[in-house]
Amino acid sequence: MKLLAVKVECSHELEDGLSFFMQDELDAQGIESRKRSDFVAEGQKHDSSLVELDDIENLPKDLELTAYFNYENADKKELVKKITDKIAEMKGYGLNTGEVSISTKEVADEDWNTAWQKYYHVIDFSRHLAIVPEWEDYHPAFSDQKLIRLDPGLAFGTGGHTTTQLVLLAMERALVKPMSVLDIGTGSGILAIAASKLGASHVLGTDISDEAVTAAKENIALNDVNNINVRKANLLKDIDDKYDLIVANILADILLELIPDLDSHLNKEGKVIFSGIDYLQLPKVEKALAENNFEIKMKMQEGRWIGLLIARKPD
């Protein structure tokens, strides 16, 4: 299968928001991210001189995001226009867009599947969790550390995004006993797998993307878990059961659509974890939660991104 690669060079402030948009709204089959700061930090960690950065091929000025689309179905001009419009919208939120350029090219599927792996390494997240690419050999840093093995393939969610890490942090605090968990927009399945590893009794992961559902199932198979189901669904549509914990790492506008339906899908003492919220959009989310009888129990922030642990207001 041929792919259309759309490369966006811009400020690192756009990374999470633009990645979400291209994955969830434009149906990108994969996102590759390269930040200059990552290479600089890696060089400093190994006491390398910055001169060595000159040897890295096409080192980005700041951030380089490359989204991959099915070539046969992609409308090149329309994709570029939508991305351009989204960047203008994000600039309106107050984000620094930097010097923006957008380019496209045709690539072979198998070229991307192997090339991106060199940018993905172990994330030693906490004493409880480490995220490990399935091709790397890694031994837990702590005796009780759980490993999440991933081959992200063509689906979003490697564990490197700030928004994902905020959810993981909240899950470590919320999953204090066996709980049923619903992971909305499961992507690569990373949060569903993490929930299982942290002691969930049962997990359902859903996604609107067929490719994400397939990738999540493949990643689940890499891990020693047998209590996760994955299926295609649009938010809470066609979800009949109630859960102890609902997790959604999605853009704020989509979270706003989700909020009115939370109560009917949450058990009595249930909790909700949201991430993917730019701090400028937090007031809208807070207002919608309050109007639907929810309160924020814990708020986490990393840079511009907000994560929330939510529960019903007491009677």
From Swiss-Prot:
Enzyme's top EC category: transferase
TM segment ranges: none
GO cellular component entries: cytoplasm
Subcellular location, principal: cytoplasm
Methyltransferase recorded as keyword: yes
Name of protein: Ribosomal protein L11 methyltransferase
Family according to the record: Belongs to the methyltransferase superfamily. PrmA family.
Function: Methylates ribosomal protein L11.
Organism this protein belongs to: Lactobacillus gasseri (strain ATCC 33323 / DSM 20243 / BCRC 14619 / CIP 102991 / JCM 1131 / KCTC 3163 / NCIMB 11718 / NCTC 13722 / AM63)
